[in-house]
Amino acid sequence: MEDSQDLNEQSVKKTCTESDVSQSQNSRSMEMQDLASPHTLVGGGDTPGSSKLEKSNLSSTSVTTNGTGGENMTVLNTADWLLSCNTPSSATMSLLAVKTEPLNSSETTATTGDGALDTFTGSVITSSGYSPRSAHQYSPQLYPSKPYPHILSTPAAQTMSAYAGQTQYSGMQQPAVYTAYSQTGQPYSLPTYDLGVMLPAIKTESGLSQTQSPLQSGCLSYSPGFSTPQPGQTPYSYQMPGSSFAPSSTIYANNSVSNSTNFSGSQQDYPSYTAFGQNQYAQYYSASTYGAYMTSNNTADGTPSSTSTYQLQESLPGLTNQPGEFDTMQSPSTPIKDLDERTCRSSGSKSRGRGRKNNPSPPPDSDLERVFVWDLDETIIVFHSLLTGSYAQKYGKDPPMAVTLGLRMEEMIFNLADTHLFFNDLEECDQVHIDDVSSDDNGQDLSTYSFATDGFHAAASSANLCLPTGVRGGVDWMRKLAFRYRRVKELYNTYKNNVGGLLGPAKRDAWLQLRAEIEGLTDSWLTNALKSLSIISTRSNCINVLVTTTQLIPALAKVLLYSLGGAFPIENIYSATKIGKESCFERIMQRFGRKVVYVVIGDGVEEEQAAKKHNMPFWRISSHSDLLALHQALELEYL
């Protein structure tokens, strides 16, 4: 090995008599023009009249990094140059001689046997820490009179772009055109060192030193055709036709694939390219064998996806059986599939009794953030305290007048419930929610159905089929029960904002008069409550839910007569008469989930304890000031 180094050093030190260059010793290294024209080199100090450079100038810039020095300059072989790159020094490098070594082990490249080699696998790039270097000498035996085609030159540097931090790559630019080179000697090639490790910095044409990013280390290294994998090389060898390779304009573009002319793919002599560091630089490789998210396993048969460096324009059969191929047929289940499976398993499992169906819940992508759970009596409306006279005593009103107004409203509530909402039929068959018996409904058209003659009330009275314990009758009777609740739901949705149309003209006037008198007696209690309800209703991420101890049908009549239908959809009304408010809160949490915030608004102890058990904030309503404070908090978006 040492003998080979000496022979190359002696060969490089021979003079070149046909050279004439300008003085450029004091400029920074990375001016590649002298490399592009190796036959126009400076002569040695012993060649008379061959150069304007003096012997003293050459010797003043020479430095030895391995303990050996020449008379005029230091000749570094590849190993010495590697050591100098790793050693920070203020000295300058005078010359770099690229040396060819005999084939050995796994560090050499196998040539194709052609006499002319069109690519140069190395790259002559200096470190950013070196001072200006002197001119170079090359042996005329090593370099014929024709220029070497693939040494980086000024035209090539103009198309380069600093790679560090760059996200877009111009991979379709044409390489610079060079004069054809016919080499007669042995082709020059660096040993297969990792150029990204050897070269710490790249100096561009403008003179700015670009620090090499980690993505550059182990970048693509192209050589005339490897027969065996190289050291540090993954077993993925991409065999591609020459037409499918588009040269990039990055830092390795000109010394890797540029030819003497703008050649087509058929003129390329070296179709085999190997890639280093595949596990770290995924952006260089086509992901064709890795199927898209949850697709079938025939993805490799289609057109592979392109990468930032090169494009594979046709499928590569050799990649379909790589060790890292992803088998999508045995892929793990996705979150969407798991959600669907859980939904199928849990559907109906939480239903209480035979006829109850799960309440409609918001879709998975719902933006619901807050649920306001309201009590009805003495919170939104003043009703029970009017009947007992407690409201009149507390606020100094006329007790007989208050009781009279309460009785008139109670009569109107039950009249509406009996006349239009089948309360006579459903009083003994009360439900917690309007959809609890919808599973028994067969969807029959009710436009011509006669509820008075279907025999539902007689069967229920004689056989006592509907008991508070939840015992139910036969299938036919349950279907008739479901018909009635469906009809109630239709009437509610039709007249929730126009209860006067349901009452008729005569009763409508009486209802409006009664409402005005109650508002006057209660100092606009309902009006203040409606302000807060309307604010919540206008929010897209909030919802109102009503939980009352009144039976479901009378509760619906109250909501209609107090003009609350616009604030409470019928699906959001629950009756706690049979199961209590705590159980109603549990059903509401099961419906809307535990990620939303629940705010309970009421006046009684029962809803306060239920809210405390489920860690829900509780807003107590005991006077007008509490309603006004709630409205202000909602206006300021504290709630």
Curated annotation (Swiss-Prot):
Compartments where located: Cytoplasm; Nucleus
Stretches with biased composition (Low complexity): 56-66
Modification sites for N-acetylmethionine: M1
One of the GO BP terms on file: visual perception
Co-factor(s): Mg(2+)
PTM annotation (Phosphoserine): residues: S361
Cross-link (Glycyl lysine isopeptide (Lys-Gly) (interchain with G-Cter in SUMO2)): K14, K52
Name this protein carries in UniProt: Protein phosphatase EYA4
Source organism (scientific name): Homo sapiens
